[in-house]
Structures are given as structure tokens and as C-alpha cells.
From Swiss-Prot:
InterPro entries: F-box-like_dom_sf, F-box_AtFBL13-like, F-box_dom, F-box_plant, LRR_dom_sf, LRR_FXL15/At3g58940/PEG3-like
Entry superkingdom: Eukaryota
First and last residue of the signal peptide: none
Domain F-box stretches: 26-72
Protein name: Putative F-box/LRR-repeat protein At5g02700
LRR repeats: 126-154, 177-202, 206-224, 271-300, 330-355
Keywords: Leucine-rich repeat, Repeat
PANTHER family found in the cross-reference section: OJ000223_09.16 PROTEIN
Taxonomic source organism: Arabidopsis thaliana
Amino acid sequence: MAKRRERRGRRQHRSHRRIQRIIDGADFINYMPDDILHHILSFIPTDLAMRTSVLSRRWRHVWCETPCLDITLKHGAMNQTLTSYTAPIITSFKLVMDLNSNTVPQVDSWIEFALSRNVQNLSVFVRDFTYSKTYRFPDIFYLSSSLKLLDVTLDFFDMIPTCTVSWKSLRNLTLRFCQIPDESIHNILSGCPILESLTLDTCRLLERLDLSKSPNLRRLDINQQYRRTGPVAIVAPHIYYLRLTYSSTPSTIVDVSSLSEANLTIISSLLSPLTADGYQTMALEMLSKFHNVKRLTVGETLLQILSLAELRGVPFPTLKVQTLTVKTEFVRSVIPGISRLLQNSPGLKKLRPSTMKMHHLKGLYPDQCWRSTCEVFPTSKEIYKMLGCNDATLKLVASFMDLVLRNAKTLERMVVWLGGIYFNGDAPWFEEELFDMVETLSRNNNVSILLKQSNC
């Protein structure tokens, strides 16, 4: 009996100690400085942060001074509650709102609220389920000296300022799904004298993007995944970095004379031989504009189009690329394009192949038109069947590396990122043999070769 009471006492003592540790932990959080608590609350939506006010007297007003707000409004329930918000400056404000006849005034009032607190980073996502497309931002939206970052997502309605834009501190601007004509983007750019980064994601009505009067602009990111999205022409003599993603007619590059890094991606699975001809012409013209580009990234669709141009004997421009990234599987239809890029980059120092799932291009006949020249590489249909075979995978990786070393005479370093499908976890010897092969090639060719596993 005494031993039983002793065991029960030890269990109760351990339980009390666990409870005390929990209490001590809670006290530890309660005694944290307000700045740290505000930082913690900045990672959760504001409606959840507001609920912490019931935890204790210490927490009652903590959220009211949190400088980061994240609000999703489908109803007006939060309006009255947030009247108790007391922070003098908002560093980050994110607003997601469904637009209808009752919520239009609320959108305006929330924007005015954020600007009145000298918001620095502002993200606005307005969804229009009425399909009226008539909402316009109030003039005060375009007049802020505190904004440093602005991210606007609309539902394909107009973003046309009726006043002179003044965003004197703005450095990063992102516009998504906006209808913005040339005169409006000119007004906006004129009001952003220190703008450094511009992203245009699926914007309509834009014909000519002229950035010649934006000398501080260094990064330009354009996504044209839908038809009738712009710009049609790009004049950007000051930018250092360009990322261009398109699925229909790409932009015409007029001037990117300062460009040092470019990332080009075509997203399409419905190309025909006829449209491929048009892409081929535009792709080569675009490459010819990259006079000073030192870092270039291209995807598998563009490589297939360049392969088609190579087999047709179309002249390629000579590039000054020093670092080349190719995102593709090692399939037959991209090999001629990769070979020509390597040959026409006489100063290439570093190559970064990165395997990824390949989308079959209907109409380009990728499994037929280069069979005679690249038979050592599998077709886009064959590759996924052969990757389960260790010997075939070794041969494929070796063939690609040999192709690179034969065509890139100045190469110093190659970092090959292979998807997990290339590695057979059931055969440890296979990975050892793969890495041994890479080490031998590296030593024999005086090129540093690294093999890494990606998550693709």
C-alpha cells in the first residue's frame, strides 16, 4: 500500500511539474516585449489576431498596435471592431475584398484608412463577382508619399487614374489582371521617380511600355499567359533583369541595351507547325536583342522551338552569355537547340541544367522530326519509361554531359539538378556509380561538375 501511494505521489509530482512548465511558458510569452508580440501576430490574419484579446488583460490591446494587418472582407463585420486600432504607422496592409454594391464604399474607406496610417507595403485584391467592372480607385489612392511597395490585383477592370499620380517613395510595383492603357501606365510611371522593380501580370490594353524615363528601374517581370495581354512593345534601356513569360504573341523587344540577365519562358501545349514558325522568328529576334546578357534562363518549349530553327538551318545570333540555365528533360526534341546555344555562347563559364516535367507539344511532332540526328536521346514519351532502368538512366546522363562538353569549349563549371525520379532509392549502388561517372568526367575534362537532387 505504501509503495502504491509513493508511485501515485511521483506521478502527481511529474504532472504538477508539467503543468508548471506550461504556466511558466505562458508567463514567458506574456512578458515578451510588445515588439516581439506584434511580430508574432503579423504572421496570422487580423481576425485571428483580434481574438487574442480574450486571453488575458495583458493581451487585450496588443493586436491594436500591430503594424501589420491582413484582412479578408466578405461582410462588413470588421469595420466597427477596427475602430479601436491605434498603431500610428502601418508597415504592411493586405486587403482582400469581394466587390458588390454594398462593399464599394468599404473598399474606399479601407484604402483611406491604410493611407492615413502612412502604410509602407500595401496589397489590394478586389474580386468583382457582379461583373460590372465599374469600380475605380479613389484619387487619394494615387497620392501617397509613404508607399514603398504596392501590389494590386483586380478582376480585369480599369486602373485609370483621373489625377496626377504621386508615389514618390514607391520602389516595387506589381499590377495583376488590370486593364491599363498606355496613357495610364505613363501617368503611373511618371509619379514613381525612384521605382526599381515593375511586374505586369496578365494586364490588358497595354500596347507600348516605355521605361526610358525611369532611370532607376532595374527589374521588369512580364507575364502574358492569356491572349490579348500586353505590352506589345518594350522600351527599357535601363533594366538589368527581364523575366518574360508568354503563351501567345510575345512582346517585341525594342531596347534593352543595359540588360544583363534574362529569363524566357513559353507556356503552351497547343502549338502548330505554323504558329511555331512565328515563335521561331520572334524568339531569334529576341535573342539578338540581348547584346549584353550575361545570365540567361530558357525553358523546354523555347528550346524545342530553337531546335526546330537549328534543323532548318536558320542563323543564330552570337551571345555573350556566361551563365546558362536550361529547364528541361534530356529529350530528343530539345537537344539541337541546346547544342546551338552552347556553340553560340563562346564565353560560357557555367551551365545549370535543371530537369523538370515536360509538356508534350501537340502539332510540333517532337518524336519524329529529329529522329535521325539525336537518336541517343529518348523522345518525350520514352523518357519516363526508361528512368526506372538504372543502366538507361546512367547512359542518358552521360550522353547529355558528353554533349555539353563537346559543344561548350570554355565551360568551367556545370551544376546538374536532377529530379528525384532519376535516383533509385532501392539501388544505392546506382547513385554511387552515377556520382563516380560524374567525378570521372569532371577530372578528364578539367570542368567542375556537381550533381544535385531537386524536388521536381
